[in-house]
Amino acid sequence: MLKKYQIFVGATYNDLMEERSAAINQIIKQRHIPSGMENFGAMGEKQWNYIKKEIDNSDYYMLIIGGRYGSINEYGISYTEMEFDYAYNRGIRIIPFLIKDMDTIPIGKCEPTEEGREKLTKFRRKVEEKAGLVDYWTNKNDLQLKIANSLANVLREYPAETGWIRIDKDTNVAGFLITN
C-alpha cells in the first residue's frame, strides 16, 4: 500500500517565503502532504493551539532556519523554536535545514537586534545538538535539492508508523476500523 506522509514545515515567514514555498513544492512533488502556517485560515482558535494540532497530525517536522529568530510569544520564545521543541518532545522525526553562512544573508532578512541574533544563535546550537544530522543550505535552489535528497532518504530509512493510506472501494476496511 502506498503511504503519504504529512510534513509540517516550520520556518520564519517573511524572510523565508521563497524557501518555504520551495519546501512545500518539493513535498508535493514527492507526493506527500505539506502542512504549515500558509494554510491556516480564520479558525477562532488560539494560534499556538492550532499549531500543536497540526504538528500532532504530522508524521515529520521539517525545520528551515535562515537569518531571523521569528515572532516571539509572551515568554520571549519564537514560535519556530516552540514548534521545534514541541515536535522534539513529542518524538516526531525532525528534518532540519540551517542556512550555512549567516554573513551572506541580505540585511533585510537578518535579525535586526542583538538580542534576536543571540536567541537565533542559541536556537541554531540547540537544533544542532538535539536534531541529529543537520543539513546546511546556501540559497533557495540548494535548499530545494537538499530537501529532495533528505526527504527521499528519511522516508526510506525512517518510515513513520502513521501516514495516510488511500482506501479504495475494493479494500476490506474491517482491519482499519477501531471499535470502542
Where would I find each of the regions flagged by the language model?
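Hydrophobic/aromatic ligand-binding patch that stacks against planar heteroaromatic rings
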Residues: K53-E54, E83-Y86, R90, K126
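Conserved TIR/SEFIR loop-to-helix hotspot centered on a Trp-containing motif
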Residues: A42-E45, G67-N89
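Conserved N-terminal substructure of TIR/SEFIR domains
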Residues: M1-I64, R90, K169-N180
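A short helix->loop->beta-strand "cap" motif at the edges of active sites that frequently abuts
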Residues: N89-M102
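A structural signal for short, well-ordered beta-strand segments and their strand-loop junctions
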Residues: G36, I95-L98, Y136-W137
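Short loop/turn segments at strand-loop or loop-helix junctions that form parts
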Residues: L63-G67, L98-D101
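C-terminal interaction surface of TIR/SEFIR-family domains
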Residues: T104-N180
